[in-house]
């Protein structure tokens, strides 16, 4: 047995499923998950000594690549001053200043510890601000594991075949209305059925939890218009897309103005950080200035703030997003060319530093139904054959891939060459 196999066997006796987040268990592809020893740049190194070109990037945070010296040094320096104080620090102020400068729609920001905390808190705030209970989300979109959001959810919920999780009371779920991504008519129908009851829409501006599904041109502006018409708030969940699709997020890339924005992943530079923020009048409803309660023992902790501040300063440097787009576009085009040579039907969606691979005869993939019609079994074989080639893709047909600026064009070309060999045998 390999060391990964031994560790996985031991882990399953101690940790449910052997992992601390379901997708890591390779449930969506089968086999034994990799146990990682270290990572550097664009590469992961497992406990058995094998190196992989990494397109998971810790599920999005590693936009600069693994073990970036600026982030590592910031963490070390902060740790030398103490790990957590439970009191305000200067770095929290500096971090808030930086985030609100980079994302102009965020007048104010509250730091939390995860994307789930950010979306959960933003929805509570929207409900408190509007005095309404119902929310709209989209089929196949995932916004963390808060009860009200595990309704027709994406990500690991799709992998497990349980988009509606057991343990979520029907009384919670009844306030969550689920519409079809990229279908404005379904959203209007929900508003017309409950014109005075919907507090907010929460949406991934690029759906990254049913693989990678970009919005149609009219979709996000249409959501903004419907929220304005019916007095609801628009929450854009930029946990994946923030600072990745563009410096000011997908909201800037697609020119839509939300009332509230949720952030995570890149904002922590690899440390557990989330944030939500937006209009000043809405944020003023949050405790301690307002009646909507939210709190966290480790929110804004100095280690995480130092890591995030260092990361965002690097991400804000000129040329970062142009490089991400160039690398991702080359990978997408190369995969399509290689698949066509082998006679394999393939769609590759990509926006900025995100991409998605779909084995399908369809010309495009634009919604949950399109994703579910793709050939998952072929993806499973593709995943394992690419893994044997030293390329680590997301171990699920329902998760996006992530590029970093640490990837070289040689890494991209090597990945395309590996795919060409795999397609020939697939």
From Swiss-Prot:
Subcellular location field: Cytoplasm
GO terms, biological process: protoporphyrinogen IX biosynthetic process
Catalytic activity: (S)-4-amino-5-oxopentanoate = 5-aminolevulinate
GO MF, one annotated term: transaminase activity
UniProt keyword annotations, A-Z: Cytoplasm, Isomerase, Porphyrin biosynthesis, Pyridoxal phosphate
Keyword Cytoplasm belongs to the record: yes
Pathway(s) annotated for this protein in UniProt: Porphyrin-containing compound metabolism; protoporphyrin-IX biosynthesis; 5-aminolevulinate from L-glutamyl-tRNA(Glu): step 2/2
A GO cellular component entry from the record: cytoplasm
Gene3D superfamilies membership: Aspartate Aminotransferase, domain 1 (3.90.1150.10), Type I PLP-dependent aspartate aminotransferase-like (Major domain) (3.40.640.10)
Cofactor or coenzyme needed: pyridoxal 5'-phosphate
SUPFAM superfamilies membership: PLP-dependent transferases
E.C. designation(s): 5.4.3.8
Residue numbers bearing the N6-(pyridoxal phosphate)lysine modification: 265
Key word Cytoplasm present: yes
Oligomer and partners: Homodimer.
HAMAP family hit by this protein: HemL_aminotrans_3
NCBIfam families registered for this protein in UniProt: hemL, PRK00062.1
Family membership noted in the UniProt record: Belongs to the class-III pyridoxal-phosphate-dependent aminotransferase family. HemL subfamily.
Family annotation (PANTHER family): GLUTAMATE-1-SEMIALDEHYDE 2,1-AMINOMUTASE (PTHR43713), GLUTAMATE-1-SEMIALDEHYDE 2,1-AMINOMUTASE 1, CHLOROPLASTIC-RELATED (PTHR43713:SF3)
Protein name in UniProt: Glutamate-1-semialdehyde 2,1-aminomutase
Classification lineage: Bacteria, Pseudomonadati, Pseudomonadota, Gammaproteobacteria, Enterobacterales
Gene name of the encoded protein: hemL
